[in-house]
Every structure is written in C-alpha cells, then in structure tokens.
Amino acid sequence: MSINNHKYKSSVVFIGPTPLGGDNPIRIQSMTNTDTLDTKASVAQCIRIIEAGADFVRLTAQGKSEAQNLANIKKELQKAGFNTPLIADIHFNPDAAELAAAIVEKVRINPGNYADKRASFIKNDLSEKEYDLELERIHSRLLPLINICQLNKTTIRVGVNHGSLSDRIMTRYGNTPEGMAVSAMEFIKIFNVENFHNLVLSMKSSDTAIMIEATRGLVRMMIEEGFSYPLHLGVTEAGEGEDGRVRSASGIGALLSEGIGDTIRVSLSEDPENEIPVAKKLVEYYPRGIIFSAPEKQVSYKSPQEKPAFLKYIKGPLVIANMTSYTALNIEAYKDAGYSVNKVPGSLIKSDGAADLIITRDCPEVIPEQVSLVVPYRIWLTNTDKERVYPLFSPETFVENRVRHENLNLVLTGSYFDIEMLKKIDNKISIIVFTFNPEKERYASDEFMNSLEDNNLNFNIILNPVFNEDKLEELQIKAASLLGRYITDKRIAGISIVNKGKIGLKETNTLCFSILQCTEARITRTIFLSCPTCGRTKFNLQDAVKKVKEKTGHLKGLKIAVMGCIVNGPGEMAGADWGYVGAGEGKVNIYKGTVSVLKNVPEKDAADELLRLIEEASP
C-alpha cells in the first residue's frame, strides 16, 4: 500500500456513554448465543460476558419479536446494575433494525443483505444507470433507520462479510477484498449525504488474508475520501481451541500492529465469555501507543521467488525447530519436533507436523534418515554427512569462508545486523534466520526488511522470535499476532519459535504449524471453520464441532465449515468444500460448496452423513 496505515487515526463515536476510536482504548466485545426471546438466559449470559470484561455485548435480532425483546433484556440488566451498551445484530430485516435502533446503543447491519435478498451467485451485469438506481433504492431503504438512529443517538456498524456480498457487488468486483471495501464505501457515502456520522466499519472473513487485505483497502479508500470512521476487527468462523485463538490473533493482531482497529471481537466456538480473556491479551499486546514505535516506512518487502533447492520441495513456509538446549538427540527428542516413531526400532516417520530442519549444538553419530539437521559451521566442516546436515553461519563467518554447502546455508543475524556484510552473502544458496526479542524489539523485523529493500537485497527470511512465556494461550496469541502478517503478506520463507519459559519445543513446534495452517499458508491437516453461534442456532454447536472433527479430522486439505444457522451459514462459509449448517430445531443441512446436497438431517446422524457424502464424492 502506498498509504501509511499507521498514520490513520479514527474519529470518535459514542456507543451509549462509551467513546470509541481516536485515542480511546481499544474496546472489547462478544455476542450472546442464547435465544434472544429467552430474557432470563440472555440476561444471565450478558452478565457473564460483562463480568469477564466486555465493553459491549451484541445480541441477534433476526425478527421483530427479538428486536422488541431487547427492551426487556436491557431493563433486566439495568435492574441488576449493568449499564453496558448493547448491540443488535441484523441480517435481512430492516424492520427489526428500526425497532432495535430505538432500544439499544448500536445496530449492526450487513450491506450485502440489508436491502437485498440472499445472493444467488448469478452474474447480473448492470449498466451505470441501473447500478446507480440500485444505490438509490438502498438509500431509500436506509432512510428510516438513519432517522431513528439520529433521533436516539444510536450508532450503526456497517459490517461487511466476505461470504454475503450482494450479487450486484460480486458481478462488478467479484467475491474479493476490493468488493468488500467498495460495499462499505457505498453505504458510507449514503450516510454522509444524510449527515449521519455515528458509524463503525468492519470487514470480516474466515480467511485471515482476505480480512486483512479488505480492511487495509477500506482504510486506504477512507483516507482518499477524507473519512476516518472507527474500525471493528474480527475473523469469522475462527473455530475453537488453539486454531480459534491462532486464526483470530493472526488476523486481528496483524492489523492492530499497524495501528488499525478500535474495537475487536474474538469469535470462538466456545462459551462467549471465553472470548474476552483472549481479546484482552491481544489488546494488551498492541496498546494504542505501541504503533508509534513502528518504522516510518511501511514494509513492502517480499520474499524472493527464487528459492534454495531445499525449500523448493516444501509446500509452504519452512518450520525450523531449535533443539540447542537438548543435551541428547534421541527418539523422544525428535518426537518433540513433530516426528512419529516407526514400527522399526530406532527409525522415525516424518509426519505432516514434523519440523523441516532442526538446529542443534552438535551432530549426533547416528542421524535418522528422515531428519535434516543444522549445526554450527565449525561442526559441519568436520561432519561427513553433507546430505542431511547443513551449516549455520554468522554473516562474518559466511563471508570469511569459501567452503559452504552447495544447496543450503543458514545465516543467523538479528537487530544488530550489518547491512554491508549482508551484501556479500549469496542469496541463491542461503537463507537468513532473523532472531529477535519481540517484547523489546517489536518492530525489529520491519526495520530489517526495510533496510534490505532500501539496499536492493532480497533474501529468503526465517523469522525467529524468542519469547519467555509460561502460559500456552499467551504464547499462541503473541506468536500468531506477530507472525501472521508476515506470512499473509508473503514476506518470509519460514518461522521458528523459541520460548525460554515453561512452554517447550513440542508446543512451539505445534504452534508453528497451527499458525501456517490457520493462515492457510501451509496445510497439514483438515481445515475446520466454525461460527461462534448466536441466538439463531438451534442445536449444540460445540458438540457438533467435536463430532465433525472426530469423523473428518483425517481428511488433510479439505475445508469443512460447521455453521449454526441457515440465515448466515451458506454465505459466510465461503470457500469451504463442505458445510454442516443448522436448518432448524435439531436439523442440519449438508452443503457441497454453496449447494445444499442433503436437507433436514437429524443432528444425531449429521456427522456420519457428512463423512458418507465426502467419501462418495472422493475420486
């Protein structure tokens, strides 16, 4: 991007009494998954979310009855001493939005379905005049909501979802990040004509790369048009457990690190109050002031197309395990790096989650044939096995010595790098391992890449952040948010996470592959997407996710979405190969891509039926 996003400063809007944007803290929110007509259950869950630390709570209002009942929920919360602003989530129903806008502090609408029916994915070319007439129709449909919001000082979030763009947008722009940003800009301009500025914007997708690109694109468009509305960040259908946290942190953290984002929601297929501690950790890691330590120049460095021979055989970024702290390299040690034990005694299987290279202090006498090691240069010189053992240099050692590996050499540097020395390194047979302490040198890798680009140098880079964490969730969030943007932007050739706290290599190696999996940079297992559920869901989604994973977890590379409802599910699981979508009380529809292939399957049979259909469709 030509525009420095970290110079973007949002304007301030109020969600009830709470200011959002500008220099205010990044606000945290979650969404209930109770039936909005069940006042008692909704109030109890709102309280749990608020007590966990949320600034706002969102509830679904899919119909007028649900919208009207928001008044009862708000009243009961206030009686219990809770005045946290409430947000109504609207799809397909302007009447519900207008009712809710007079009750709650904020209403979320989706440009893809507020004034339009569900996308049919049928191309519908419009002339310029016809296109403008469509915008006029949307303008007319928005006017009642605008008037109600102006009267009640209610804020509107224009929330664009990648999976629910209108046919009009998709025909002209495709199902693309650009189309998402344009969809929001069309609504922004309508609101501006009406002098309505209590707006928040969001660009959401289950694909972190699309979410990041769409949000950056929207920021660029707003800057060019002179707008500065606050931004809500989130990754839809992030899932649960480690994947849910890693996928969310990769997308949200990438943007927070660039100074983009005023409120966040971490969408997990778990109890909604579980989202708040994760969101808090992200916000604590990227507080408002951190961006001012970022380089003035925004990173545009790209990893070179030409790769050393070793990298050409790996489908995606490299993973390196650092075992320099191990006193012995035995079978148990290799298992920590992701290798499996073969039935043949003493031999190993290089599983999909096994590190591609292992850095060690010394070279063992016997190296399992599936393992590739990296050792200090002086050790490598004396080792006879040059096939699976590679040297680790300092830049100075590389320049001073002419004996090198013909295919792959690793050169270790850090924030202390000497650019003149790096100019003398052959990038065709070398990769740079850049090590740094992200707590003290958050943007050291940005400075390094900018310096390389300024000097017309182009290396394959392995980022090697060194953490000191004792809690796995802390490490997951920090590592994913730090590395996600470099992976998504294709700036690096691989990653290697080192942790000096209580979390060991087994966990850091798994985390490396999780980050690559969740950013879809390197697929090593089934890709699962699942929504966090809301009041529209009529079955236990957490149990459904567990069952689907048990049945289909062996299907490497397949993307399977588990969605709570028929309202949003078919659209928002965009890109999934298969979908398991709630269709009513205890019923599930199964989708192949965007086409429903089996309807109203009893929930108890749905996971088995999904697997059966997948197997039947397999070649």
Language-model features: locations:
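Catalytic alpha/beta core domains of metabolic enzymes, predominantly
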Residues: 125-138, 142, 147, 169-311, ...
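Alpha-helix-loop-beta-strand connector modules within alpha/beta enzyme cores
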Residues: 66-88, 137-153, 218-227, 377-379, ...
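N-terminal amphipathic alpha-helix/helix-capping segment at the start of soluble metabolic enzymes
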Residues: 1-31, 36, 146, 150-152, ...
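Active-site mouth loops of central-metabolism enzymes
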Residues: 23-41, 85-93, 169-181, 236-246, ...
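Hydrophobic faces of well-ordered beta-strands that scaffold small-molecule active sites
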Residues: 26-32, 57-59, 84-90, 107-109, ...
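Glycine-rich tight-turn/loop motif centered on a GG-T
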Residues: 105-140, 168-178, 381-390, 434, ...
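Glycine-rich, proline-tolerant flexible connector loops at the mouths of alpha/beta enzymes
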Residues: 33, 54-77, 111-123, 129-133, ...
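N-terminal active-site wall of soluble small-molecule enzyme domains
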Residues: 61-103, 327-331, 343-344, 365-369, ...
